[in-house]
Amino acid sequence: MVFDYAKITRSRLMGSMGLIIRYEEDEKYIYQYFLLDGEGLGIADYVSLKNPTSKEACREEERLMGGLGESRVLVDEEIALFLINHFGNKNLEYGKDLPGDVDEYIKIITDYKSNLTLNQVYPIISKPIEDEVEFINYMTMSINIW
C-alpha cells in the first residue's frame, strides 16, 4: 500500500479527534477512519472502507468528523502513524478493547517506532484558544468531564 494522504481535526482541546488515512493499492483506495479520544480512552472507533464511492467516503468522513466542530488539516504519514500508535497504546494500557477490525492496524500499535513526541504533535491537533468565549467553553467542557 502506498500512503496517499491523512487528515485530522484540530479538536484535541475538546477531547476527541477524527483521523482519516487514505492508501492506494492497485489503483484502488483504502480509507481508514479513526476516532481518537484524548481523555484517556485511546482509539474509540475505527472503520475502514475499501474502494468506496466518493459519496460513501464523504459520508463516513462526516459521520466521524462532522460533529467535532473544528477544521481538518493534512498531516504526513509519520504524524498519522504516531497518533494511531500513541492512542492505541492507551487502549492497551487501560485494558480497553480496540475497535473495529483490529488486524488492519494492530501492527502500527505494536511495531511502529517514531522519534515524535506528543508535545511536538500537539500544536497540529489543537486549535489555539483565541478569545474569552473559547476559554469559557473549554473550561466548561473540562469541568463537566470530571
Model-predicted regions and their roles:
Residues M1-W146:
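Non-catalytic terminal/accessory regions
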